[in-house]
Design a protein with these regions (language model features):
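Short, glycine-rich nucleotide/cofactor-binding loops
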Residues: 3-12
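Conserved N-terminal subdomain of the carbohydrate kinase-like
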Residues: 1-3, 19-70
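Residue-level recognition of alpha-helix initiation/capping sites
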Residues: 12-13, 53
Length: 71
């Protein structure tokens, strides 16, 4: 599977949470990072977007080189 999501430094949301959920179900999660977020429960301090072309390239390379069964 592949998750297309932001990176949450607290691991309570975003691709880190998606990866934990995938692991709990016995799946391996590829990622495409859309943004990096500085946050904690109830607080978002900063968001930095990833260039859309880089996000698209992450998706493409994952699809080209790995068996992706779900997105």
């Amino acid at each position: 599977m592949m998750t297309v999501a932001g990176s949450d430094c607290s691991a309570g949301a975003g691709l880190q949470a998606d990866m934990k959920a995938a692991h709990a179900m016995g799946a391996f999660a590829l990622t495409a990072v859309t943004c990096v977020v500085s946050e904690a429960p109830g607080l978002v301090r900063g968001i930095q977007e990833v260039d859309p072309e880089l996000v698209a390239d992450q998706v493409r390379i994952n699809l080209e080189h790995f068996p992706v069964s779900a997105v």
